[in-house]
């Protein structure tokens, strides 16, 4: 697709999305486009600080949990003494960026709105970790907390997975992994998926959308994939191309959120249509005027706050 044939996205987004796009952080250096991945991770963490300000205060604890790959950092958010369920959160960032700090506000709001314990898992990033290491770390953390639930004062009889972007893929992949391998970590009551990628290699939205404003050009998406996967055969794995998994049975209830001007939107639409066609419990909601990654901007965007509330409400309705 010639770039000039794409939609003029920045002219079409909502007023509040434009405010976010035009928000300058004067102390921020330029994005290190030609820098190392370590420099890009450092920049991403620095840039997200502004957007994480003002999140709800609550009891928070940091723990390292064992996996076969080594210890993985986790952060537990306790919004209240009662513990109706535990929700595991997987951050986005194209598998190569992001951490518990970059998504701290998202997790705090999700805990506040659901009144459930939220556990963020700081899975090892790519390319240092290759598929399926991140999923195996997430599953290992889930199993660990299931076995040690009383020690951490959490309710692991009912759990959920949630994530944005690449984290959404990891959330659903982890739930399917537990189902397929018959691993008991408690009942998976729901999965919350904000603008994820689920295995499409091409689509209308991938052609019409994506640019420097969202880091989701065709070249960007290829780079993330090459960093994450171990080999070409992994592209067809049912835990990477989730459409190659069995989506006709025992899929936990899924809340699927789409951003209107996201090149990955068709992934969400196809996931919803597939699940709905096979009577799997699911809900799809499109957030008008939004770009990919809008969930970060709840400090300025009512729509981002609404999307988090919608996901929390969906999850608690399953309990």
Curated annotation (Swiss-Prot):
Alphabetical keyword list: Cytoplasm, Hydrolase, Serine esterase
Active site positions, chain numbering: 165, 262, 292
UniProt motif (Involved in the stabilization of the negatively charged intermediate by the formation of the oxyanion hole) ranges: 91-93
EC number: 3.1.1.-
One GO cellular component term: cytoplasm
A single GO molecular function term of this UniProt record: carboxylic ester hydrolase activity
Function of the molecule: Displays esterase activity towards short chain fatty esters (acyl chain length of up to 8 carbons). Able to hydrolyze triacetylglycerol (triacetin) and tributyrylglycerol (tributyrin), but not trioleylglycerol (triolein) or cholesterol oleate. Negatively regulates MalT activity by antagonizing maltotriose binding. Inhibits MelA galactosidase activity.
Subunit record text: Homodimer. Interacts with MalT and MelA.
Protein name: Acetyl esterase
Gene name tied to this protein: aes
């Amino acid at each position: 697709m010639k770039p000039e044939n794409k939609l003029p996205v920045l002219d079409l987004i909502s007023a509040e999305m434009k405010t976010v796009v035009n928000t300058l952080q004067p102390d921020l250096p330029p994005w290190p486009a030609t820098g190392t991945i370590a420099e890009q991770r450092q920049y991403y963490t620095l840039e997200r600080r502004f957007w994480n300000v003002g999140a709800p205060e609550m009891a928070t604890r940091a723990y390292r949990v064992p996996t076969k790959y080594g210890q993985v950092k986790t952060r537990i958010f306790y919004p209240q003494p009662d513990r109706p369920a535990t929700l595991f959160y997987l951050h986005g960032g194209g598998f190569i960026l992001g951490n518990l700090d970059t998504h701290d506000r998202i997790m705090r709001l999700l805990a506040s709105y659901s009144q459930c314990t939220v556990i963020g898992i700081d899975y090892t990033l790519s390319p240092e970790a290759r598929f399926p290491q991140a999923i195996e770390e997430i599953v290992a953390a889930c199993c660990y907390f299931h076995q040690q639930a009383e020690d951490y004062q959490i309710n692991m009889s009912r759990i959920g997975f949630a994530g944005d972007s690449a984290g959404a893929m990891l959330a659903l992949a982890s739930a399917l992994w537990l189902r397929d391998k018959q691993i008991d970590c408690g009942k998976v009551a729901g999965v919350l998926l904000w603008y994820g990628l689920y295995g499409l290699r091409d689509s209308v939205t991938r052609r019409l959308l994506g640019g420097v404003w969202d880091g989701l050009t065709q070249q960007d998406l290829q780079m993330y994939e090459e960093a994450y996967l171990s080999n070409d055969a992994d592209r067809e794995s049912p835990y990477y191309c989730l459409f190659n998994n069995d989506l006709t049975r025992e899929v936990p209830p899924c809340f699927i959120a789409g951003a209107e001007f996201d090149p990955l939107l068709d992934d969400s639409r196809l996931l919803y249509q597939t699940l709905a066609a096979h009577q799997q419990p699911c809900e799809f909601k499109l957030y008008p005027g939004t770009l990919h990654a809008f969930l970060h901007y709840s400090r300025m965007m009512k729509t981002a706050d609404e999307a988090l509330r919608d996901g929390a409400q969906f999850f608690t309705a399953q309990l």
